[in-house]
Amino acid sequence: MKGSLIVAGCFAGGFIAGRLAEYSPEWLHTASLWLLYLLMLQVGMGIGSDPKVKEMLRTLTPVSLLLPLTTVAGALILTYPVAFMLKAVCVTDSLAINSVCGYYSLSSIMLSQLKEPLVGATLAAKIGAVALLANVVRELIALTGAPLIARHCGKEAVIAAAGVTSVDVCLPAIRRWCGERYVGLALVHGTVIDIASPFMLTLFASL
């Protein structure tokens, strides 16, 4: 929860600074690109050095892969009616935003970089902001709504709602409201989405 609020605060501060600035400095694009590279490096190092990887591999079965696949499929299917109702972001960009299932840091930076050559810096920044806010809100809902989701929708639904954060931020909530036996499934779920997110986002952003 605290981490999500810090992210939202940083976004608000950056937005205000951008509005007050008379122009966007040339180094900003280069800096954000290198931040993206460092983020991808951190993702790989985080997965490789995680001591829970062995536990995850022990619980890895073909059946356990169905949950992340279902999570992503559900997010993409629900994108269509929401995108048509809101009309703020086109369907393909909405698919890119939802395909990462809560990975706000990756989606905001990477989507802005991918869309800038296609739609310009201003619109790309707006799309990145929508990606950030949408995925932060998803994480907050998963954290605060975990007990209700577990009670009315089932334990697996808590993991699905957490999306990629089932491997880190939402893991304590999953352990508390779902039980220890769901921890391994949560790790597999979050890691699979973590690995697949950059590829899915790139695919939909290029459409």
Per-segment meaning from a language model:
Residues M1-M56, P62, L69-M85, T202-L207:
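Structural signature of multi-pass alpha-helical membrane transport proteins
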Residues K2-L5, S32-L33, R58-T70, D93-V100, ...:
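Cytoplasmic-side transmembrane-helix entry/capping segments in multi-pass membrane proteins
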Residues C10-F15, Y37-Q42, S64-I77, I97-I109, ...:
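Small-residue-rich segments of transmembrane alpha-helices in multi-pass membrane proteins
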Residues R19-S24, P81-T92, Q113-V130, F204-L207:
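Helix-coil boundary and interhelical linker segments in multi-pass alpha-helical membrane proteins
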Residues L36, M40, A142-A146, V158, ...:
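Alpha-helical transmembrane segments and their lipid-water interface positions
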Residues T92-I141, I149, C153-V188:
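Alpha-helical membrane segments and immediately flanking helix-loop junctions
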Residues C178-L207:
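Long hydrophobic alpha-helical segments typical of transmembrane helices together
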